[in-house]
Amino acid sequence: MRPVAPQRFAVYKSKPFARFARKARISDLDLWETARLANAGQIDADLGGGVIKQRIARGGEGKSGGSRSIILFRFRARAVFVYGFEKKNLGNIKSDELEAFRELADVILGYSDSEMAKRVADGALIEIQPPKGD
């Protein structure tokens, strides 16, 4: 049996999330670190069906009063930031929104690497590059 090469953990953001992150002054490095922590098992809230909620610490600030993110997540494979909000504006997402995120997770987390590359090429997703040395 041939050994299987380890899969690379990839991090993406949707175009709407990219707009939110820009307005909230959340850097790609902040997003990468948030996804890295989730991949290390430090998940703030597992909402089921491949959907997690993570607090985002902006450079130099803590997590408690800051932004929240909804991430489509598969351990050691992929994290896709799809929705962001400020804690002061929204405590939690509604159950119908959660169901829609779970359905989206079913689709996106099922994509092959080549399908993900197509989504990046057509501009639907933006791949976040790991920091140098990761």
Task: Please tell me what each predicted stretch does.
Residues 1-26, 118-134:
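Arg/Lys-rich, positively charged N-terminal/basic patches that mediate binding to nucleic acids
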Residues 4-5, 19, 36-40, 78, ...:
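Preference for short coil/turn "hinge" residues that link or interrupt alpha-helices
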Residues 1-6, 30-35, 58-60, 102:
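Polybasic/polar functional segments that serve as interface/processing modules
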Residues 18-19, 33, 61, 89-92, ...:
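A broad, structure-centric signal for solvent-exposed, well-ordered loop/edge residues
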Residues 44-85, 89:
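Basic/aromatic recognition patch in beta-strand/loop cores that engages polyanionic ligands
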